[in-house]
Swiss-Prot record:
It is an enzyme of class 6 (ligase). The keyword Cytoplasm applies. Zn(2+) binds at residues 27, 207, 232, 236. It comes from Dehalococcoides mccartyi (strain ATCC BAA-2266 / KCTC 15142 / 195) (Dehalococcoides ethenogenes (strain 195)). Pfam families: DALR_2 (PF09190), tRNA-synt_1e (PF01406). GO terms for cellular component: cytosol. This is Cysteine--tRNA ligase. One of its GO terms (molecular function) is zinc ion binding.
């Protein structure tokens, strides 16, 4: 299996640090507001990567943090007259509900920055002791000029970084690119006791401390959006490797493309958000997955109603195939399940090519539909179809059924009655049965092998 490593800028063979195990850390949200579909894009992609690694037999330990203290959280909380922790926890709850609605596998741990302050202080103290960091005015900064290979992830030199650097008023840095590990307290902000006085953690050190606590000094995969490569992930490498002395901090860096609305990135700062809640009120979770997975995780994706409507139609086709009832009277037809599985695996082994893997599922679905139309069935094909869809996180569950399994015998009886009426050329009565079942949310499909029924989606 080959994956693209941002650090090397090329495809590399995936070999975990420990045989059979994968330690995976994905940067989580800053819960200043409701999650948007840009978040959905990122976490759907990493959910599929995690699911596929599990399918390949790896035991995956997956950590995803919450940056629950931040300048923007503080500003929004102050504007609403509430505590920053209240705002953060409210939005974390909304986020977790959204992830469940999207069928995203929960992380093994969701550490919060505010709960990891002792570990953060330990790391900052260690970096000062080793000469990599210094205190100034109650804040602590990392000396980037002392960091060997600083810029290796973003492939930039310090001179290139300096072009856009500036020192904020009140900062007392030795060098403009030095970044804050600990921020001195300001009036009206949450703060914690530290050896340097009251303050709060810097953004970058939070993830280093949490990954160190839950995954150790080295991890296999670190994921996040491409907008995090610099400065966030670059700075994570610097402080983690300087603190532990172990290199590399991360073996494989994976970054997903960003979601655009027109020509602009979808983001809170631009105010052009579509929340996950809004999207799910119009489209199914399966449709959102198909929309995201129809492109490489590394590519940018443009949000459009047309693309999501097309994805919904595709999801509906897959749901109808998955909902097919087993009919023992139909002839078993062979499907080359080995070839379909090999195709799927070959594509996913090539840097998680979900677009081609998804196309394989649609191809298998079309073959199953053709077999059914010709009066046959393929039990193995149907099982593989559901298995591969599950690896991509597609639930393919008919939404809000208007019937239950208890009604199945009654529906079967009506289908037999309709068959007898048609044989007796009582077409009007036969059609009335079809119409009545349709109104109740039951779709009838006639084929050479007989009539089958399916539950319609909403």
């Amino acid at each position: 299996m080959k994956i693209y490593n941002t650090l090397s800028g090329k495809l590399e063979e995936f070999v975990p640090l420990e045989d059979g195990k994968v330690k995976m850390y994905v940067c989580g949200i800053t819960p200043q507001s409701e999650p948007h579909i840009g978040h959905a894009m990122s976490y759907i992609n990493f959910d599929v990567i995690r699911r596929y690694l599990s399918y390949k037999g790896y035991r995956v330990k997956y950590i995803q943090n919450f940056t629950d203290i931040d300048d923007k959280i503080i500003a929004k909380a102050n504007a609403q007259g509430i505590e920053p922790s209240t705002l953060a926890e409210r939005n974390i709850g909304v986020f977790l509900d959204a992830m469940a609605a999207l069928n995203i596998t929960p992380a093994d741990y969701y550490p919060r920055a505010t709960q990891e302050v002792p570990k953060i202080i330990e790391m900052v103290s260690g970096l000062i002791e080793k000469g990599y960091a210094y205190e100034a005015g109650g804040s602590v900064y990392l000396r980037v000029q002392k960091v060997e290979g600083y810029g290796k992830l973003s492939h930039r030199t310090l001179e290139q970084m300096m072009a856009g650097a500036r020192i904020e008023p009140g900062e007392e840095k030795e060098y403009p690119m030095d970044f804050a590990l600990w921020k001195a307290t300001k009036p009206g902000e949450p703060s914690w006791e530290s050896p340097w006085g009251l303050g709060r953690p810097g953004w970058h050190i939070e993830c280093s401390a949490m990954s160190l606590r839950y995954l150790g000094e080295q991890i296999d995969i670190h994921g996040g959006g491409q907008d995090l490569i610099f400065p966030h992930h670059e700075n994570e490498i610097a402080q983690s490797e300087c603190f532990s002395g172990v290199k590399p901090f991360v073996k494989y860096w994976l970054h997903n493309g960003l979601l655009k609305l027109g020509e602009e990135k979808m983001s809170k700062s631009l105010g052009n958000l579509v929340t996950i809640k809004e999207a799910l009120s119009r489209y199914s979770a399966d449709a959102l997955r198909i929309f995201v997975l129809s492109s490489s995780y590394r590519n940018p994706l443009t949000y459009s109603e047309e693309a999501l409507e097309a994805a919904e139609k595709g999801a509906e086709r897959l749901r109808q195939t998955a909902a097919r009832q087993d009919n023992p009277r139909l002839q078993e037809i062979n499907v080359d399940v080995k070839t379909y599985r090999e195709r799927f695996t070959q594509y996913m082994d090539n840097d998680f090519n979900t677009s081609a893997a998804l196309a394989t599922i649609f191809d298998l679905g079309r073959e199953l539909n053709r077999i059914e139309a010709e009066g046959g069935k393929s039990t193995q094909g149907q099982e593989l179809f559901k298995e591969l869809a599950g690896i991509l996180g597609l639930s393919l569950i008919i939404a809000e059924p208007t019937t239950s399994a208890d009604a199945a015998p009654f529906i079967d009886m009506l289908i037999e009655l309709r068959k007898d009426l048609r044989l007796a050329k009582q077409y009007q009565l036969a059609d009335k049965i079809r119409t009545s079942l349709d109104a109740a949310g039951i779709l009838l499909e006639d084929s050479a092998g007989g009539t089958i029924w399916k539950i319609k989606t909403k």
